[in-house]
Curated annotation (Swiss-Prot):
Endonuclease that is involved in the suppression of homologous recombination and thus may have a key role in the control of bacterial genetic diversity. Acts as a ribosome collision sensor, splitting the ribosome into its 2 subunits. Detects stalled/collided 70S ribosomes which it binds and splits by an ATP-hydrolysis driven conformational change. Acts upstream of the ribosome quality control system (RQC), a ribosome-associated complex that mediates the extraction of incompletely synthesized nascent chains from stalled ribosomes and their subsequent degradation. Probably generates substrates for RQC. GO terms for molecular function: ATP binding; ATP hydrolysis activity; ATP-dependent DNA damage sensor activity; endonuclease activity; mismatched DNA binding; ribosomal large subunit binding; rRNA binding. It comes from Geobacillus kaustophilus (strain HTA426). Residues 709-784 form the Smr domain. SMART domains: MUTSac, MUTSd, SMR. Its EC number is 3.1.-.-, 3.6.4.-. Belongs to the DNA mismatch repair MutS family. MutS2 subfamily. This is Endonuclease MutS2. ATP binds at residues 335-342. GO terms for biological process: mismatch repair; negative regulation of DNA recombination; rescue of stalled ribosome. The keyword Glycosyltransferase does not apply. It holds the Pfam family Smr. HAMAP family: MutS2. It is an enzyme of class 3 (hydrolase).
Length: 784
């Protein structure tokens, strides 16, 4: 990029604003060296870096860079054996502390949120020197004074100094309080000259106290004398202070040596802090401008949505949508020379430079910037009515230089192209220059007030007309860019508003050709149509935003309902779990009671006792209503004796024996026979062709309960259901030991069985079978 172009488009002023957000001289140094890049990957990386810094500001709200100083000169001097001053040591410690805090901040956000790869790489190179920080802070206060705590010797020397000073003051106080002092002394004070304590003595009494004269007043009437009584003490004080100075020098040398040990990692830290300060300055500047990260491309396409000039008041700047490099590669902004066109031209150029420098642009999200190899601009700052030949020549020199270098990777900006010479010749030159630049494939934006160029946008493919809207009421440009509509002269309207006689205006209109008059009317009609279309679009956008707002509101309400549903479901689950635990306790109690009856009575347990116990167990189980759909499905089936059914309240399968009433069936559930209401039955299938014989009694070890359960080939869930039922039956049958055959296979079923046995209350212990019992394919269970 040519420095002249950067100055013309005021990129240097953007850098001045950016510099206001740097926290250290390191960041300012980076900003001063900032130049737009023409490398797409580099630009994308710079923008990503700014984006990451903006994310950190959003998440953390601040960055600890205030204490950062350029300590590179300190590090160099320490590395060659120099002694740093207390202030320089404090700056090293402050920079190290800022580095440590910054590293922790970015590392913490990286671990928690991710997506900060570039900043994390900088943070990873930051050195931590907590011991050095501690030593410096322990030895030097915030004002750069070496503290007593820096060393035991320094503390002792300063104690001596304070003691000697106290003795000196005591002696001098006795002198100035003596009766003779009033006439001998100019003032009853103790002061210091040449680092020695003295008193002001009148000239005529110079020999009254002996000692040494160190100074005199301007008039010579007062002598500052060190009385003989304190000469030795002052000598002792000077000696102690000399030793103090030597000790301070030793402490500073020692601290400087520690800095030298850390010089290399601290130098790398400075470079990383410079990059971080620069990145956060860009992010803060973006926040100030309410700027957005643009997408970037190398195909010469730019689309700035709601773009604003960064150097204008962002609250007052008029946003514009600008597109170039898609359907058209040249924009010709026509219309009167009112100033609005130049602002638009500079906005396009400056936003392009900002994006290529890794800065966010003052535009809306969804904006896109092209990365050009070169940006050229011929923009005159003076927009006077009369333009001299020298001005035309100056512009032509710029244009000749542009034409010498322009290519398909260039953005070219012409302000008032062809102005400053004969209008007819100037318009012809402007058209020829635009044709040349357009033919080379460059992206071009040109402003002109020549009416001849209005037709240019209609006659050339890839070229579009545009204008800056002018408010005839206020006689000012609105700065609103109208793409597709050429500018029109507002001379008659402006003259009328300013009070020019209507007769003169009508005579002037008569001088204008009918063709020109028709063109002006057509342009005015286009402006009205575009304005109406924009108003319609604004209303549609407002309606869409309202719909989006309502959708977001309902989504939030839906999420709240889902959360409430989840909470209630959790409560219900907890209640169900409590009920199930109570049911399990009741089941255990019933089983224990049955076993006690069998052992104590040594008698048959009648069927009605088992049925009664099972019904008590069923009563203890939680009642869960089934879905209406399931009820309807069940009610549609006409139950028949022998049907296989599921008792939903017990979660047990069985067979229908007979219907005992209009809505009750007798159901065979394993060894039990129960009366179940029809609504509690769920049809599974027809029974196999075999007799269903009710079991009348259970005696001791029932013959219908096998001593082993074969689960091989069963699905995992079904196997555990069968295992649970089998263990209940085995307990009721009074078995002390049973065998569970699960096979070896993958071991999943074996593990599931043994995990289930660990939690079953009736299981006393279990083990794998011996070799003659089936080995690891069988689990032997001891029941309580």
């Amino acid at each position: 990029m040519q420095p002249k172009v950067l100055h013309t488009l005021e990129f240097d002023k953007v850098k001045e604003q950016l510099a206001e957000h740097a926290s250290s001289p390191l960041g300012l140094e980076k900003i001063d060296a900032l130049m737009p890049s023409s490398d797409l990957e580099e630009v994308a990386a710079w923008l990503d870096e700014t984006d990451e810094a903006a994310a950190v500001l959003r998440l953390a709200g601040y960055v600890p860079l205030d204490g950062v100083v350029d300590i590179r000169p300190h590090l160099k001097r320490a590395a060659i054996g120099g002694t740093l001053s207390p202030q320089e040591l404090l700056e090293v410690a402050a920079t190290s502390a800022a580095s440590r805090q910054m590293k922790r901040l970015i590392a913490g956000l990286y671990d928690e949120h991710g997506g900060l790869e570039r900043l994390f790489r900088y943070a990873d190179t930051l050195a931590e020197a907590p011991e050095l920080e501690h030593d410096v802070r322990r030895s030097i206060d915030d004002h750069g004074e070496v503290l007593d705590a820096a060393s035991d010797r320094l503390r002792s020397l300063r104690g001596q100094i304070r003691s000697v000073e106290a003795r000196i003051r005591e002696k001098l106080e006795s002198i100035i309080r003596s009766p003779s002092a009033q006439k001998r002394l100019s003032d009853a004070i103790i002061t210091i000259r040449n680092d020695r304590y003295v008193i002001p003595v009148k000239q005529e009494y110079r020999g009254a106290y002996g000692g040494i004269v160190h100074d005199q007043s301007a008039s010579g009437a007062t002598l500052f004398i060190e009385p003989q009584a304190v000469v030795e003490l002052n000598n002792a004080l000077r000696e102690a202070r000399a030793k103090e100075k030597q000790e301070i020098e030793r402490i500073l040398r020692e601290l400087s040596a520690k800095v030298a040990e850390q010089a290399e990692p601290l130098a790398r830290t400075v470079e990383a802090l410079a990059a971080l300060d620069f990145a956060f300055a860009k992010a803060k500047y973006a926040r100030r401008l309410q700027a957005a990260k643009p997408a970037v491309n190398s195909r010469g396409y730019l689309r700035f949505l709601q773009a604003r000039h960064p150097l204008l008041d962002q609250e007052k700047a008029v946003p514009n949508d600008i597109e170039l490099g898609g359907d058209y590669t040249t924009i010709v902004i026509t219309g009167p020379n009112t100033g609005g066109k130049t602002v638009t031209l500079k906005t396009i150029g400056l936003l392009t430079l900002m994006a290529q420098a890794g800065l966010f642009i003052p535009a809306a999200d969804g904006s896109e910037a092209a990365v050009f190899r070169s940006v050229f601009a011929d923009i005159g700052d003076e927009q006077s009515i009369e333009q001299s030949l020298s001005t035309f020549s100056s512009h032509m020199v710029n244009i000749v230089d542009i034409l010498r270098h322009v290519d398909g990777e260039s953005l070219v900006l012409f302000d008032e192209l062809g102005a400053g010479t004969d209008p007819q010749e100037g318009a012809a030159l402007a058209i020829a220059i635009l044709d040349e630049v357009h033919g080379r494939g460059a992206r071009t934006v040109a402003t002109t007030h020549y009416p001849e160029l209005k037709a240019y946008g209609y006659n050339r493919p890839g070229v579009v007309n545009a204008s800056v809207e002018f408010d005839t009421e206020t006689l000012r440009p609105t700065y609103k860019l109208l793409i597709g509509i050429p500018g029109r002269s507002n001379a008659f309207d402006i003259s009328r508003r300013l009070g020019l006689d209507e007769r003169i205006i009508e005579r002037a209109k008569a001088q204008v050709s009918a063709e020109s008059h028709n063109v002006e009317n057509m342009i005015a009609s286009l402006e009205r149509s575009k304005k109406q279309a924009e108003e319609d679009e604004a209303r549609a956008r407002a309606a869409l935003e309202e719909a989006e707002r309502l959708r977001a509101e309902w989504e939030q309400k839906w999420e709240e309902l889902e959360e409430e549903k989840a909470e209630r479901l959790a409560e219900a689950t907890q209640k169900a779990a409590d009920i199930i635990r109570a049911a399990e306790r009741e089941a255990e109690r019933i089983i224990q009671e049955l076993r006690r009856l069998q052992k104590e009575k040594q008698a048959e347990v009648k069927e009605h006792e088992l049925v009664e116990a099972k019904q008590r167990l069923a009563a203890a189980m939680p009642k869960v209503e089934k879905r209406k759909k399931a009820k309807k499905a069940a009610s549609r089936h006409v139950f028949q004796p022998g049907d296989e059914v599921k008792v939903t309240s017990l979660n047990q399968k069985g067979y229908l024996i007979e219907k005992v009433s209009d809505d009750e069936w007798q159901v065979q559930l394993g060894i039990l026979k129960m009366k179940i209401h029809e609504r509690d039955l769920e049809y599974i299938g027809s029974a196999p062709a075999k007799d269903v014989t009710p079991i009348a009694t259970v005696k001791g070890k029932d013959a219908h309960v096998s001593l082993e359960l074969d689960l091989r080939g069963e699905r995992y869930e079904d196997a555990l259901i069968r295992l649970e039922k089998y263990l209940d039956d085995a307990v009721l049958a009074g078995y002390a030991r049973v065998s569970i055959i699960h096979g070896k296979g993958t071991g999943a079923l074996r593990q599931g069985v043994q995990q289930f046995l660990k939690q079953h209350r009736a299981v006393k212990s279990f083990r794998f079978g011996e070799a003659n019992e089936g080995g690891t394919g069988v689990t032997i269970v001891e029941l309580k």
